Amino acid sequence: MFSETLMPRFSETDALGHINNTALPVWFEAARTPFFRFFTPDLDCNKWKLIVAKIEVEFKGELFYGQEITINSSISRIGNSSFVICQEVYQHNELCAVGHATMVRYDFDKKASVALNDTEKAQLMEHFKAS
């Protein structure tokens, strides 16, 4: 599991005084960076090997500006050419949101998915957490 700590920005609040729902997918993407490095260690977009096939966010509670959040990211499924990253957002040790991102190993030249190799699967398995 990877863990990332972020401080919500004022610009991420809405008229109701809590963090806007549009902020979480951005936070989740930032917290997926360690997984991206398995496929593109230098994060060079010209060598990118992943696409997002699906994202989901389930809100469990409110999140507030100026109060640190923690995002825990783990792998919940590994397929032939895809895997699912499960992400949980905590504020004050309370679970506030859960996200899932289905990532696909992709060849941009062929415009097709590619099977995960054994090394990639092994790296992902190190962060596997059954849901």
Describe the function of each predicted region.
Residues 1-54, 108-131:
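Hot-dog-fold acyl-thioester-processing enzymes
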Residues 35-83, 96-97, 104:
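Hydrophobic beta-strand-centered segment that forms part of the acyl-chain substrate-binding groove
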